Design a protein with these regions (language model features):
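Conserved acidic segment of CheY-like receiver
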Residues: 1-11, 16-17, 47
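Alpha-helical interaction/dimerization surfaces of two-component signaling modules
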Residues: 16-20, 38, 90
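Acidic, metal-coordinating helix/loop segments flanking the phosphotransfer/catalytic sites
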Residues: 28-46
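Conserved phosphotransfer cores of two-component systems
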Residues: 40-42, 64-71, 90
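Conserved phosphotransfer microenvironments
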Residues: 45-65, 81
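Alpha4 helix (beta4-alpha4-beta5 surface) of REC/receiver domains from two-component response regulators
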Residues: 60, 79-97, 102
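Hydrophobic/aromatic residues positioned on beta-strands within the core alpha/beta folds
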Residues: 75-77
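C-terminal output helix
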Residues: 99-112
Length: 116
């Protein structure tokens, strides 16, 4: 699975990718501008989006993803409930909080079942 992961904390993103997403091809981007560029130039099966990033809020990117690819699965991965709620309100398909990444494969599998 080709995953676009919007996360501005590089050490955390590396750890999550290594520990929980190693079976996937993951493109980690630290900002909205980098996420927009990656989405425009690549094809992704899934987006993971944090809420607070250096150049804005992830809900803006989620709305853009929804407008561009309405069926693209998007998982909200903020460490704050309010951030996850904003991401879901913007169109995220599911939530997997930062401290719950041990559940990420279950969340991905659930989204894949819903798409079939």
């Amino acid at each position: 699975m080709n995953i676009l992961y919007l996360e501005n904390h590089a050490v955390f993103a590396r750890q999550v990718t290594r520990q929980f997403l190693s079976a996937h091809q993951v493109t980690v981007v630290p900002s909205l501008s980098a996420a927009r560029s990656a989405l425009a130039s690549g094809s992704f099966d899934l987006v993971l989006s944090d809420f607070d990033v250096d150049d804005g809020k992830g809900d803006e990117f989620v709305r853009e993803c929804r407008a561009r690819e309405p069926r693209l699965p998007i998982i909200a991965v903020s460490s704050h409930d309010d951030g996850n709620a904003a991401l879901v309100a913007a169109g995220a398909s599911a939530v997997c909080g930062k401290m719950q990444f041990d559940r990420i494969q279950q969340v991905i599998a659930g989204l894949n079942r819903e798409r079939v």
